[in-house]
Amino acid sequence: MRNIEVPAGVIDYDETGSGPPVVLLHGLLMDHTLWDRVLPLLPEGFRYLRPVLPLGAHRHAMNPGADLTLPGQVRLVADLLDALSLEGVTLVHSDWGGALFLTARGRDRRVARQVILPSEAFGNFPPGLPGKMLALAARLPGGVRLAARQLRVSWLRRLPFMYGQMAHRPVPGELIRRWTEPVLTSPGIRRDLVAYCRGRFDKAALTRDTEALAGFHGDVLVLWSPDNRVMPAAHGHRLAALMPRAGYAEIPGAYVLSMLDEPAAVAHKMGEFLTSTPAATEPGQGQHRP
């Protein structure tokens, strides 16, 4: 793992390959290993970067006073792309939808293309039953640690309010242990996660920020899982309709974490998109234009 400093703190990231950059994101209580099954199946000729965002499975607590609410996390992603001096980025969203708001914030200059797997969007923050349960746990004393310990019990994490609605296939225990270790052992990591979960989620403002994607002019693949119950199927179609150069495809049978349920299908669709649409040849290709 490499790391780089941004104003909020130190961010770890994994990097492999060379060529136009592809940045693969993740959701709460997950890290870069979410993409382990897909990464070897993606086409060569690209530089794949997998940052570990401060969403609960990170290894370095952020700086005291860092803004880790949703707006702060959006800035952090933009700051990370700046710190890495990336141009013509293909940004891949999964589960956490915060980085969709780079356009609304005027911080998408480095983003040329996007791939949007089932993610929070419009007013669906926190998403579905699992998201609302984690938000509730973050407001209770000791709630985050209790939730993390429960996730380590295989039959409990298959319940709908845990991972039962996130992945169709059982999530391996070794992944769960890795993802929950930081919040179980580090008060600083718990503080960071709680700071995000206790932030304000204004559904009207979130919907407006999502709709700002109409100003994104790069190529987009919305790769939705219509069988999931957490990110509405209608949101996938709505996202694709928003952006002038967006296409829509589906991964049947998968839930939110389609890269775990159907890694070969996800890699195939992503690979087709990466190799059939040109990466940006100059900075700002995907930038919001008035």
What label would you give each PLM region?
Residues 227-231:
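Acidic catalytic loop of the alpha/beta-hydrolase fold
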